């Protein structure tokens, strides 16, 4: 017997509706990454950028990801890590370290 996978443990929670929900969450995450990347580039170029509402959108992404069955949520881990990295890069541009 091979290793147990989450799909094997939760087979009933991996239907077409769950797959559509996961794809929707994936699209939202991809959009957030693109938006933050664009904002970062504009900020680096000296432009003013309004990021109001971005925290709510990231919160929506996280909540929707948590609503997915475990196996599908786990598939989003690389996207979540990429989003986190982009949030960190954008935050660093917004609040650069002060020289001593």
State where each predicted segment sits.
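C-terminal-biased regions
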Residues: 2-45, 49-100
């Amino acid at each position: 017997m091979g290793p147990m996978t989450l799909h094997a443990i939760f087979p009933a929670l991996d239907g077409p509706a769950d797959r559509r929900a996961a794809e929707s969450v994936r699209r939202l995450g991809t959009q957030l990454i693109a938006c933050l990347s664009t904002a970062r580039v504009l900020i680096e170029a000296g432009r003013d950028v309004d990021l109001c509402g971005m925290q709510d959108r990231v919160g929506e992404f996280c909540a929707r990801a948590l609503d997915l069955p475990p196996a599908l949520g786990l598939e989003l881990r690389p996207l979540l890590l990429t989003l986190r990295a982009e949030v960190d890069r954008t935050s660093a541009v917004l609040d650069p370290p002060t020289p001593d």
